[in-house]
């Protein structure tokens, strides 16, 4: 089966409701992809279905226990249409799983490759997307680059969801907002724009939203790549973003009205805008008496001047 791409390199088309045709299309898209699990099954005798997900990025036990098994055990007294079946499943079977509907192949494929599960039903032009993400990740460990004597020892990981939770744990305020989007034409990397709704400058927030939206790059694999694509003056010797692997430092930046960018697969976040004096602050400064912390900053600044001289 021929896969049709548009000028923007996105797969065109939507589900047709013909199970054989739709399933064959997805099989063709995922040809030679050994990590894609395609699990066709029958809901009694009158409806075929299939669950499709990425092995290693999806909670397979959740798919089996809360999706496939309940559907196979469900007793149907009479034959119903695909749309009626979809509605019944959403209202009575998927009570313990977050889900949404999708119909375009572009959205469906993005969801599958993000770790969600596609439930394809015969006779239905819409599919159910189940939230079953379970990325492999390391646990929260001790910071390696910004070590402190006093203060928290935890650090960000490569899992963006863990990183946003570490920030939310420190700022339990409903005005803390996290806008999620994807960047990278091919990598489709998750990115979060994090800010305090009542403290951030609206014009700065809108500017960052627009810049993130206009990123045109095939693969985004780390926050450093985002930093290079967003900075205004590429020739400036001074950093325009501050990178940190400390959740408490990111939280402090948010409470100062700054914006934090969290990128999936990156063991740190970006704080912006960055000022010159921010790079002379240490993590310990937040947990030390003001006089002592200020004196330490003056010493660091003086030492930097001597080093340059």
Residues covered by each model-derived region:
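Membrane-embedded alpha-helical signal segments
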Residues: 1-306
């Amino acid at each position: 089966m021929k896969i049709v791409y548009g000028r923007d390199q996105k797969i065109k088309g939507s589900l047709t409701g013909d199970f054989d045709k739709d399933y064959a299309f997805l099989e063709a898209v995922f040809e030679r992809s050994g990590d894609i699990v395609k699990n066709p099954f029958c809901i009694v005798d009158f409806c075929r279905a299939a669950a499709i997900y990425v092995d290693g990025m999806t909670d397979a036990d959740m798919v089996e226990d809360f999706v496939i098994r309940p559907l196979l055990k469900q007793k149907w007294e009479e034959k119903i249409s695909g749309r009626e079946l979809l509605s019944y499943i959403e209202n009575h079977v998927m009570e313990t799983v977050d889900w949404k509907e999708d119909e375009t192949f572009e959205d469906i494929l993005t969801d599958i490759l993000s770790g969600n599960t596609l439930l394809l039903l015969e006779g239905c032009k819409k599919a159910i997307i189940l939230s079953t993400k379970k990325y492999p990740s390391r646990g929260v460990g001790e910071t390696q680059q910004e070590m402190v004597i006093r203060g928290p020892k935890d650090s960000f990981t490569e899992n963006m969801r863990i990183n946003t939770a570490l920030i939310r744990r420190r700022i339990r305020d409903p005005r803390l907002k996290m806008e999620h989007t994807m960047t990278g034409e091919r990598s489709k990397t998750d990115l979060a724009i994090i800010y305090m709704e009542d403290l951030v400058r609206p014009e700065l927030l809108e500017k960052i939203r627009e810049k993130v939206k206009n990123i045109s790059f095939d693969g985004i694999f780390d926050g450093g790549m985002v930093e290079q694509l967003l900075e205004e003056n590429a020739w400036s010797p001074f950093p325009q973003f501050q990178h940190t692997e400390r959740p408490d430092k990111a939280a402090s930046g948010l409470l100062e009205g700054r914006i934090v960018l969290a990128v999936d697969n990156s063991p740190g976040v970006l704080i912006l805008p960055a000022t010159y004096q921010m790079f002379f602050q240490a993590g310990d400064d937040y947990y030390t008496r003001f006089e002592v912390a200020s004196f330490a900053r003056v010493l660091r600044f003086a030492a930097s001047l001597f080093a340059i001289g």
